[in-house]
């Protein structure tokens, strides 16, 4: 809430690993936006007001990927659970599909199992795997991918 997103209106930020589970902290973050209630409105570093409510930036400018489940074992089971929780907390429009391959997960079968398990979560998860949200972050993504292949 420094005003940076207002100063750079085209800037979009992508955080990895659901930003460490940001969905669990959204209520707290929203609460801290109430500067008058907290008595910080008169403090220079805290008193600057953004042009829009916090959720505007959350829904339009901040993106999160779903990598970072737990490591190489049980990628399908634990990875899909991580994505399921994440999609309950962060809008599909802001969630990008990702894996930890080849870092934490080095086995192609584990990755394939993870992808299948995520797709099985339902239409939102399938849309995420298919890149619907990524197209919001990266303009002309499909055209760029076609050119590079």
Predicted regions and their residues:
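Histidine/acidic residue-rich metal-binding segments in metalloenzymes
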Residues: 1-61, 77-93
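Mid-to-C-terminal alpha-helical segments outside catalytic/metal-binding sites
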Residues: 2-3, 11, 21, 63-64, ...
């Amino acid at each position: 809430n420094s005003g940076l997103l207002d100063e750079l209106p085209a800037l979009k930020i992508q955080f990895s690993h659901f930003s460490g589970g940001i969905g669990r902290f959204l209520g707290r973050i929203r609460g801290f936006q109430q500067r008058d209630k907290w008595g910080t409105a008169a403090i220079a570093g805290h008193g600057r007001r953004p042009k829009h409510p916090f959720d505007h930036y959350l829904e339009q400018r901040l993106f999160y990927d779903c990598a970072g489940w737990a490591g190489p074992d049980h990628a399908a089971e634990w990875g899909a659970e991580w994505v399921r929780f994440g999609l309950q907390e962060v809008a599909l429009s802001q969630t990008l599909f990702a894996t930890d391959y080849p870092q934490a997960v080095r086995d192609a079968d584990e990755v394939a199992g993870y992808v299948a398990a995520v797709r099985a979560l339902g239409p939102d998860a399938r849309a995420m795997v298919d890149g619907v949200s990524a197209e919001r972050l990266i303009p002309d993504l499909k055209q760029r991918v076609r050119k590079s292949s």
